[in-house]
């Protein structure tokens, strides 16, 4: 299916929109990425499936000003002595998506209304922020993709244990590289256990059919495009 990628100014922010060329209302997925160009490796393959084996969908990406600030849910210590601490301002970005970006898209383009057709996904810290957004705004998001997400983030498992009850009728795609837990860093080395518990919590709350946990070959940076494509395909197979 042919598509367009357009850029829109929203105050101080730049919004990139991937939209298949169709007049039918579309589901919307917000993408937590360092820049919209990160999708160049998989958009053509995704678009080729749309209208055939996959329902068309719109993707929206607002480039973050500061990755560690915009995708961290609350302040936390730095991973390394020479790195800045996490500033913890993901709430502001989530509100930007929910209260500005999504209304802008629905006013400008035909979109499918409701949380069942609205999702968010991301990779690494962006994946953590995507899953956090599902907890933070369950009134808006009904699906999330967390790929190699930073679920080792300080306090995040406790946050999930305390808030898992707020999730219902949602779908979650989880993905992790099999080698990611092979690290000497004490926090990042817990990623395998963090993913296992997260998957268990979500399956109990949402049902096994609504949660996918894929373990992929390689480490954190292995086949990012391919894994993003798998996550998008799984989420869009339900819309």
Where do the model's predicted regions map?
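Non-catalytic cap/lid and distal C-terminal segments of serine-dependent acyl enzymes
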Residues: 1-239
């Amino acid at each position: 299916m042919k598509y367009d990628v357009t850029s829109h100014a929203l105050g101080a922010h730049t919004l990139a929109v991937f939209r298949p060329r169709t007049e039918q209302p579309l589901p919307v997925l917000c993408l937590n990425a360092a820049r919209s160009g990160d999708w160049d490796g998989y958009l053509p393959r995704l678009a080729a499936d749309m209208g055939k084996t996959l329902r068309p969908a719109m993707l929206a990406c607002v480039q973050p000003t500061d990755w560690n600030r915009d995708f961290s849910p609350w302040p936390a210590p730095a991973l390394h002595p020479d790195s800045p601490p996490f500033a913890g301002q993901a709430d502001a970005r989530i509100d930007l998506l929910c209260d500005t970006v999504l209304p802008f898209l629905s006013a400008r383009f035909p979109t499918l209304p409701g949380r069942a057709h609205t999702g968010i996904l991301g990779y690494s810290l962006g994946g953590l922020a995507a899953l956090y957004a599902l907890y933070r705004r369950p009134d808006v998001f009904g699906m999330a993709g967390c790929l190699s997400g930073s679920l080792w983030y300080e306090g995040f498992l406790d946050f999930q244990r305390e808030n898992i009850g707020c999730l219902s009728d949602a779908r979650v795609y989880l993905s992790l590289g099999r080698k990611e837990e092979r690290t000497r860093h004490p926090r990042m080395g817990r990623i395998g256990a963090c993913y296992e518990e997260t998957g268990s919590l979500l399956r109990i709350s949402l049902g096994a059919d609504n949660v996918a946990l894929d373990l992929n070959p390689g480490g954190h940076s292995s086949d990012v495009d391919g894994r993003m494509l798998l996550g998008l395909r799984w989420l869009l197979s339900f819309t």
